[in-house]
Amino acid sequence: MKITPLLLIGPLLIAGCAGQRVEHPLAREIRRTGVQPEFFRIEDKDAEMHRAVKEARKTVGAFIAALKSPAKGQHDFEVKKPFVKDGEVEHLWLSEVKFSGNRFHGLVDNHPRKIKGLKFGDRVSVNPDEISDWAFVDHGKLVGGYTIRALSLSLSPERRKSFENETKVRIDTQ
């Protein structure tokens, strides 16, 4: 990834109250009936988020191996791509990820808020060294998802548990 500011908004919406409808196991979007979703804004000074991106890039080979030959119980393979346009940066998850030609190819799995002209479901590609995260679920446990883990650290234990209950995905933060 070749961006200076690390600004994450929109790609992970975490909410912890009843009435939510979870559309995806990794909870890219959680909506609450009748209210705006919560956004967690991560500024470039957030050292934990920088470490998360660095760890995701360092370990992307393990993700590629699992993606190419998933074991039983492994599913929902996704990568997070930074989109940059007119000085704006937005990190969005890609679903239905494939790896070919030394690139990830997938569908934008968030509703972009800052990058005009990009929309949910657009097919895009990204180089492995430019991702800001990767994740998949293995028997109900999050694998990778380093930015998700970093964000979950800011939640109270009760909110984290509620999030896990809603998404049916366990997040180990250690």
Residue ranges and their predicted role:
Residues 17-93, 98-174:
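Mixed-charge, low-complexity intrinsically disordered regions
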Residues 7-15:
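Bacterial N-terminal signal peptides
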Residues 1-7:
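Bacterial N-terminal signal peptides that target proteins for export
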